[in-house]
Amino acid sequence: MAKQDYYEILGVSKTAEEREIKKAYKRLAMKYHPDRNQGDKEAEAKFKEIKEAYEILTDAQKRAAYDQYGHAAFEQGGMGGGGGFGGGADFSDIFGDVFGDIFGGGRGRQRAARGADLRYNMELTLEEAVRGVTKEIRIPTLEECDVCHGSGAKAGSKPQTCPTCHGAGQVQMRQGFFAVQQTCPHCQGRGTLIKDPCNKCHGHGRVEKTKTLSVKIPAGVDTGDRIRLAGEGEAGEHGAPAGDLYVQVQVKQHAIFEREGNNLYCEVPINFTMAALGGEIEVPTLDGRVNLKIPGETQTGKLFRMRGKGVKSVRGGAQGDLLCRVVVETPVGLNEKQKQLLKELQESFGGPTGENNSPRSKSFFDGVKKFFDDLTR
């Protein structure tokens, strides 16, 4: 059966630059790699075709020969009986430079895996987030075995060199004229085997444990902030470095304040007499109570800014402000005397609309009148 064109295999044009070829190779290699398609013979065959095409088309001399003579350039007797370019190719160079970053391949022994990072969600009150706090947390994790100290081998013994790869962590497989290096299936790339495993960790070098940590939360953090504790994640495999622990901050809803950036907001209810005449009222801050002066004729929704009464950001800079939004309350539970006084007040305003004393009401009702006048014209 005729071999498929190398350019068609990679899906590139015959004028494609090397970077286009590498890009196409990475995409296809990830799709058809045996590690992702275990037991799929068609994918394995396709992967071999992709590797072969890549090796030829990224070698300037081989590509020129292929462009001139096609597949015959690499067959015995090709190019006038010179034997083409077969036999001596070492595909491990390609894996090391291009493919190793995807699947961990390449030459040399595979390094023991770094420990996994861990995440802990920490809920804080607003006061804790603003002032800072130290909290103890308990984390289920994998820690280095204290008996074998991460080696996985029983005391008095040690890991032995893998007889399959002789400690290299890689084995060489010949595929046609290619010599391809792959991770040793016997030792999984470590280059060593544990013949006499530790009784506590059973050769894993790590044990399950729940550890207690004291975490210092800096002042000014907010929901979404993340604190990294280096080396407090899971222990690495066979002595490799530990991962990190990330503490994710979530600030609980507060009964009085809402936070927006470095500013705090709160609603301050006042009665309608204070709104009309003015006065002073106590308002809460995170540092205690302070007096807020309310000027006469204050309307619902008016904001009063108290500078420096907000939050100082964990990232530095000026402290935020506290913004108090006034809500004018309608009186309830009135007695007869109070109702009579309000009626007299209403009459003094000139009726329910009180146009002289309620500029917004006058503007509203003037607009309503114009609307209906326009409808009847």
UniProtKB/Swiss-Prot annotation:
Protein name in the entry: Chaperone protein DnaJ
Compartments in which it is found: Cytoplasm
Organism of derivation: Klebsiella pneumoniae subsp. pneumoniae (strain ATCC 700721 / MGH 78578)
Cofactor: Zn(2+)
Principal location: cytoplasm
CXXCXGXG motif repeats: 145-152, 162-169, 184-191, 198-205
GO terms of molecular function: ATP binding; heat shock protein binding; unfolded protein binding; zinc ion binding
SUPFAM superfamilies the UniProt entry points to: Chaperone J-domain, DnaJ/Hsp40 cysteine-rich domain, HSP40/DnaJ peptide-binding domain
Family designation: Belongs to the DnaJ family.
Highest taxon above the source species: Bacteria
GO terms for cellular component: cytoplasm
